């Protein structure tokens, strides 16, 4: 079977067959590291807890262009509902099926073969190439990229440009690249009351009744107008839980969870201050715990955006759209170091779904795009 596969597809198949459900790596990183060592990369394994990470670098000079990605995948859901077994990596009618095909083992394979071709053609390229790989992107994301970035900062490593292999495309590979992401902050709110009998409300204090106007104001708050790169900030209440399950008992507390996806017009401190001002305005007795998942980041212009646009135009013959839509990515840990960051990967229509799949032609084209980005950044004008 493998005789008929392109090098990129062959590697993608090998990776998908390793059931690396987060935070497990299932040997994917060992496979990648061995390939990278063969073409002159120095490998540093960086395990934290049960999470596997590695940093690889070829070259010692600036500028440094880094590929960031993850080997872990989300759980499959009921395997009997898959048309093709999720870890069989079956190829049929030009489509690669399997968990991780689009998110993001196809990208890992594409960048690997791009690097192999690039190094063979340009063994004395300027600057350096790095790989930052984790098995903790789809899970808690506490022992993965964020820890590797801390290690790199402590070592004095400076990333100039970073390509994150997240599935950014919508209809065809490269039609959309992410040049930023909104910030994400979540809150767990406990509104306190006094439990009692519904027939004697004067002897109780109903936290649901007290919280309702405050929650309505939070939900309707106009946080900002957004800007040219980001939509307006959005707050969504995701969980509300209160009561004993009985109809005749006023609950003693109400538990609420909400999340804000915010633009560069705001920061986490301002969100906390404005949210709690609303809670206090309504006289609530409450406890609140905040968790910042990431500040917003943006690469509005520069060599990385230009190189990516040129590469897509060269391979696909089409222009690309810059976007900051969607959820968070590990780019949020890399951008604060000062690096320019873009996300470029396959189409995302089936990510995290049953029957995840990617067109074989997409990952082959993606490999060519990655190779041309490297040439634009590390070759053009230097040879």
UniProtKB/Swiss-Prot annotation:
Zn(2+) 1 binds at residues 70, 103, 166. It holds the Pfam family Peptidase_M20. GO terms for molecular function: acetylornithine deacetylase activity; cobalt ion binding; succinyl-diaminopimelate desuccinylase activity; zinc ion binding. The active site is at 72, 137 (proton acceptor). It is an enzyme of class 3 (hydrolase). Gene3D superfamilies: Zn peptidases. Homodimer. This is Succinyl-diaminopimelate desuccinylase. It comes from Hahella chejuensis (strain KCTC 2396). The lineage of its organism: Bacteria, Pseudomonadati, Pseudomonadota, Gammaproteobacteria, Oceanospirillales.
């Amino acid at each position: 079977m493998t005789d008929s596969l392109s090098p990129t597809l062959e590697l993608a198949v090998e990776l998908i067959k390793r059931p690396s459900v987060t935070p497990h790596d299932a040997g994917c990183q060992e496979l990648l590291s061995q390939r990278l060592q063969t073409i002159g990369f120095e490998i540093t394994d960086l395990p934290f807890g049960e999470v596997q990470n590695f940093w690889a670098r070829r070259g010692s000079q600036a500028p440094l262009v880094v590929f960031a990605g993850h080997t872990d995948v989300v759980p499959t859901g009921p395997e009997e509902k898959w048309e093709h077994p999720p870890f069989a990596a079956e190829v049929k009618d030009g489509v690669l099926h399997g968990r991780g095909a689009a998110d993001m083992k196809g990208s890992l394979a594409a960048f690997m073969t791009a690097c192999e071709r690039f190094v063979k053609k340009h063994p004395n390229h300027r600057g350096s190439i790095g790989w930052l790989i984790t098995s903790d992107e789809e899970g808690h994301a506490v022992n993965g990229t964020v820890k590797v970035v801390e290690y790199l900062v402590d070592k004095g490593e400076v990333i100039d440009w970073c390509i994150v292999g997240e599935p950014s495309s919508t209809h065809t590979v490269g039609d959309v690249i992410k040049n930023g992401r909104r910030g994400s902050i979540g809150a767990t709110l406990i509104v306190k009351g006094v439990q009692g009998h519904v027939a004697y409300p004067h002897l109780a204090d109903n936290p649901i009744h007290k919280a309702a106007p405050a929650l309505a104001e939070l939900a309707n708050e106009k946080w900002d107008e957004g800007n040219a790169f980001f939509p307006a900030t959005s707050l969504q209440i995701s969980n509300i839980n209160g009561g004993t399950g009985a109809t005749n008992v006023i609950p003693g507390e109400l538990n609420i969870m909400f999340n804000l996806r915010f633009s560069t017009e705001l920061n986490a401190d301002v969100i906390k201050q404005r949210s709690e001002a609303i809670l206090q305005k309504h006289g609530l007795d409450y406890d609140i715990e905040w968790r910042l998942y990431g500040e917003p980041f943006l690469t509005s212009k520069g060599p990385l955006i230009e190189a990516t646009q040129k590469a897509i135009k060269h391979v696909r013959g089409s222009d690309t759209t810059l976007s900051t839509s969607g959820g968070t990515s590990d780019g949020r840990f890399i951008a604060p170091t000062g690096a320019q960051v873009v996300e470029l990967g396959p189409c995302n229509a089936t990510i995290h779904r049953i029957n995840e799949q990617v067109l074989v032609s997409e990952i082959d084209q993606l490999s060519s795009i990655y190779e041309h980005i490297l040439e634009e950044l590390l070759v053009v004008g230097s040879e």
